[in-house]
């Protein structure tokens, strides 16, 4: 990816994290722990999920365990060909896409300000790690459905993921 495109992708990702946190801060305190709909996560759980995703990505970028791939090789091949390009191009995650087990939030409660601060810190740390590795040949991270994604792919997917959860919070 040319440097200008990388810079733009990273800026878009940082902006998406800011929009997500802004949407989370706009949730009234009284609604912070209330599920958005029956069987859905609360705003607090949405934020905890995003924080956990960043935590797992950061761990993998530091050389530790990332997400566990939950699809068979042939499923990954089909999904990478049929679904992933649309997500990256159009910025929409399919409805009812499963969250990775490693990033499913507990039931809470979650203290609002410390969680928002931790999410910003985790997102910023991952962005820094991605930038440090951008010129590393073969650098990639693991997605639980699509398998190994290149750094430009994961930056874009992260932007789409943040925007996905921003829209969910704004509908509350």
What residue ranges belong to the model's regions?
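Short, helix-capping/interhelical loops that line the mouth of catalytic, cofactor-
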Residues: 1-8, 56-119, 140
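Short coil/turn linker and secondary-structure boundary residues
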Residues: 1-4, 27, 41, 110, ...
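N-terminal start-of-chain detector that recognizes signal peptides
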Residues: 4-6, 18-19, 127-129, 138
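Long, hydrophobic N-terminal alpha-helical segment
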Residues: 5-6, 12-13, 19-20, 24-45, ...
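Amphipathic alpha-helical segments that line or abut small-molecule/effector binding pockets
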Residues: 14-21, 120-127
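Short alpha-helical hairpin
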Residues: 22-31, 93-102, 134-141
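Short, contiguous alpha-helical
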Residues: 33-88, 124, 128-172
């Amino acid at each position: 990816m040319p440097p200008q495109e990388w810079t733009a992708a990273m800026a878009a990702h940082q902006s998406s994290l800011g929009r997500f946190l802004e949407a989370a801060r706009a949730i009234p305190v009284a609604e912070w722990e209330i599920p958005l709909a029956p069987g859905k996560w609360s705003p607090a759980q949405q934020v905890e999920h995003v924080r956990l995703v960043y935590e797992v990505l950061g761990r993998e970028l530091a050389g530790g365990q990332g997400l566990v791939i939950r699809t068979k090789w042939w499923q990954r091949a089909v999904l990478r060909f049929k679904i992933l390009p649309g997500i990256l191009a159009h910025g929409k995650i399919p409805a009812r896409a499963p969250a990775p087990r490693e990033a499913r939030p507990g039931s809470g409660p979650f203290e609002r300000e410390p969680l928002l601060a931790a999410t910003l810190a985790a997102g910023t740390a991952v962005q820094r790690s991605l930038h440090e590795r951008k010129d590393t040949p073969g650098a990639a991270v693991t997605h639980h459905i699509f398998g190994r994604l290149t750094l430009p792919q994961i930056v874009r997917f992260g932007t789409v993921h943040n925007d996905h959860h921003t829209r969910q919070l704004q509908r509350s």
